[in-house]
């Protein structure tokens, strides 16, 4: 079965009404760029988050000739507050009249930033928005409770925020992935298979330069730092479990801790025409969902199910899926839920290889989705992210023929 949009005008007349939310039919994605992804304390170890984001933002504005968008909307997960998106925009030299604000949905921040930007354009509040995200785990601020407050006497500094009532541990996300493996009866062999696949496809993309058109080089970086071309089963078998009483989670089947930035340009049809821009895709819609915060990895798949149901689509209608594989258990859940789509999933590998710069990851996989659709000459694509605290976000877009 071909995607509904492959049938042209007749399909649009039949299905078009289900894609109209406000004037979402009017939201176009012109293009975007991402940095190379660095590992924590790696090639960007001396680069603050706002400077890394600014370096990519400046290149996006220059490449797509958008000197003064209506908004800058940027995701960031581990900053210390203070609307770091505004600081980043000012660092990039954006006109002070352009408002910028930060989205914090943790891992889903970058994708939710794109969804919010699309909604603003759809409802007529804006004509052009640059959206995405940025993160520096290397320079992540330390946070702590007020030592002078009687309720927090003796509390230590922390780096991982509190995601659910009554639980505040540095290992809470790892514990959630471990629990997901237990509940879903996932085997080590299944996890290993996805780790090897991710690194193999990422290494192939790196060697072939498949993603070179979406890279914004900065600060001397020349490649994605986390990809391991020689990842092997032998290496996976030697890795210890990261949790004291864990059975599944290792350093390989959970994502790296990373630095990176990515932004896309969204605009209306009128802005596109007025400024002589060419769209790569049309944003058709998005959803968010909630789930058990103890097993947040599942929400990436739940969000996709909700997205497809909302727009009356099935997996066979989608030409490429890109999911932020923060843990290999997410891949296993995807394959079990959408068994016909394994061959059209994370075409260039995923976060197990590239890493996961929290605030940027949603924008990164959106850019990878565009490149995958271009390569396969597909029409419809989905991006999805599971976020800490049990939140899932998913986006549906249609590639526009050049």
Residues covered by each model-derived region:
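Active-site-proximal alpha-helical scaffold in enzymes
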Residues: 105-135, 181-211, 264-270, 357-378, ...
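Conserved beta-ketoacyl condensing-enzyme motif
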Residues: 45-108, 112-121, 125-128, 134-153, ...
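Active-site pocket-lining segment
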Residues: 178, 284-353
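Conserved catalytic cysteine-centered active-site region
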Residues: 76-127, 167-172, 233-256, 337-365, ...
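Active-site pocket-shaping loop/turn-to-helix segments
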Residues: 34-61, 78-79, 101-115, 127, ...
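N-terminal extracellular/periplasmic Venus flytrap/periplasmic-binding protein-like
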Residues: 34, 46-55, 63, 190-274, ...
């Amino acid at each position: 079965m071909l995607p509904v949009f492959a049938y042209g005008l007749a399909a649009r007349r039949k299905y078009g009404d289900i894609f109209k939310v406000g004037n979402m039919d009017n939201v176009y994605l012109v293009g975007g760029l991402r940095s190379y992804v660095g590992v924590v304390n790696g090639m960007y170890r001396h680069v603050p988050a706002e400077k890394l984001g600014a370096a990519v933002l400046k290149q996006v504005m220059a490449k797509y000739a958008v000197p003064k968008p209506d908004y800058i909307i940027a995701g960031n997960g581990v900053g210390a507050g203070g609307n770091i998106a505004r600081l980043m925009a000012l660092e990039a030299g954006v006109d002070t009249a352009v408002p910028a604000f930060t989205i914090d949905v943790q891992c889903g921040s970058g994708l939710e930033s794109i969804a919010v930007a699309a909604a603003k354009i759809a409802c007529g509040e804006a004509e052009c928005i640059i959206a995405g995200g940025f993160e520096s785990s290397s320079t992540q601020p330390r946070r702590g409770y007020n030592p002078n407050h009687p309720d927090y006497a003796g509390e230590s500094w922390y780096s991982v925020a509190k995601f659910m009532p009554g639980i505040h541990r540095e290992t809470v996300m790892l514990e959630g992935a471990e629990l997901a493996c237990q509940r879903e009866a996932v085997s080590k062999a299944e996890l290993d298979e996805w780790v090897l696949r991710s690194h193999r496809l990422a290494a192939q993309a790196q060697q072939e330069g498949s993603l070179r058109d979406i890279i914004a080089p900065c600060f001397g970086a020349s490649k994605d730092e986390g990809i391991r071309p020689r990842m092997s089963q032998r290496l996976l078998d030697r890795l210890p479990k990261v949790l004291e009483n864990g059975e599944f989670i290792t350093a390989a089947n959970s994502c790296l801790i990373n630095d990176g930035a990515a932004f896309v340009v969204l605009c209306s049809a009128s802005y596109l025409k007025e400024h002589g821009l060419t769209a790569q895709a049309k944003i058709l819609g998005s959803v968010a969902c909630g789930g058990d915060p103890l097993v947040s990895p599942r929400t990436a798949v739940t969000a996709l199910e909700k997205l497809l149901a909302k727009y009356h689509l099935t997996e066979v209608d989608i030409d490429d899926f890109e999911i932020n594989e923060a843990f290999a258990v997410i891949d296993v859940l995807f394959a079990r839920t959408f068994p016909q789509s394994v061959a059209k999933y994370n075409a260039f590998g995923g976060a197990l290889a590239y890493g996961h710069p929290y605030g940027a990851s949603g924008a990164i996989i959106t850019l990878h989705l565009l490149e995958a659709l271009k390569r396969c000459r597909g029409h419809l694509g989905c991006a999805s992210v599971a976020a800490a605290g049990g939140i899932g976000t998913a986006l549906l877009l249609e590639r526009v023929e050049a």
